[in-house]
Amino acid sequence: MRNISMATLALTTVLSTGLFAADDLPGKGITVKPVQSTISEETFQTLLVSKALEKLGYTVDKPSEVDYNVGYTSIANGDATFTAVNWQPLHDDMYQAAGGDAKFYRQGVYVSGAAQGYLIDKKTAERYHITRLDQLKDPKLAKLFDTNGDGKADLTGCNPGWGCDSVINHQIQAYGLGDTVNHNQGNYAALIADTIARYKQGKSVIFFTWTPYWVSDVLVPGRDVVWLQVPFSSLPGKQKGTDTKLPNGANYGFPVNNMRIVANKDWAEKNPAAAKLFAIMKLPLADINAQNLRMHQGEASQQDIERHVNGWINAHQAQFDGWLNAARAAAK
């Protein structure tokens, strides 16, 4: 009788272990295809989501790097699964054009408090009393930021297709700057590197940037550069009519954005564990800034970023495990 009891116990243990493993890995056998933009600094927050999905049993491909509008279309069509870099409201036009809420699952806020705007070097701002972008209607002030000899201010701007590009183009016209300001577009990383080099040479600079990103850790607002305000709120497309004025009365031209995880709606409905994960993950903006600075300082390989992600998980293990437990519970 003792032998039978032990055998029964052993069998029960095996079965329960198997059942636990199945519950533990609700994504087993399912492949996930993440997308992000070509901004390599977005890899950190994307990989953090991928690592969590892998812990749930999903097979997660390396993120595809595409333009934002292509990414949204790919997710809507089911050719990609999710993006962790949906800027809201900056990307509202692209989100709606690709199908909006009918095609996408979007719940929760992954990163909050993302800022954007225009900055100039502090030395020039103080010497010429420049506090607002529309002051560059004055050709004499605009010429201070001329880099190519045409007499216009050369604003280091936003890559085509990022969303901020259309805002900058709109605001240049709205604030009457078409004759005095050039919006320099191309490879932002190369343009901002040139801008920083000019700053270090003591030259006047004007540029657009955003957080989370490393630029504000190199050209520090308040120390090296200052944010410029705008004369009034003016945004294009779906953001038209949005008041960008802050509670303290300052107006930097852009609303504070949240970064959200967007997934294919049909896929999310079939994968409640992943859907729950997408809804509850949260990453502090300051942590992305810190990681992006490490990339700028040379730790920018895929292995480096993987190490950064694993380090973040180790430092926030209880929170990470809590996300996984909630996701597993949603699948039951």
Swiss-Prot record:
Signal peptide extent: 1-21
Regulation: induction: Induced by increased medium osmolality. Repressed by glycine betaine.
Gene disruption: observed consequences: Uptake of glycine betaine and choline is completely abolished in the ousA-ousB double mutant.
Main location: periplasm
A Gene Ontology cellular-component term: periplasmic space
Keyword annotations of the record: Amino-acid transport, Periplasm, Signal, Transport
Cell compartments where the protein resides: Periplasm
Record bears the keyword Lyase: no
A Pfam family hit: OpuAC
GO BP annotation list: amino acid transport
SUPFAM superfamilies reported in the protein's UniProt record: Periplasmic binding protein-like II
MF-aspect GO terms: transmembrane transporter activity
Subunit organization: The complex is composed of two ATP-binding proteins (OusV), two transmembrane proteins (OusW) and a solute-binding protein (OusX).
Function: Part of the OusB ABC transporter complex involved in glycine betaine and choline uptake. Binds glycine betaine.
NCBIfam families listed in its UniProt record: PRK11119.1 (NF008334)
Name used for this protein in its record: Glycine betaine-binding periplasmic protein OusX
Organism: Dickeya dadantii (strain 3937)
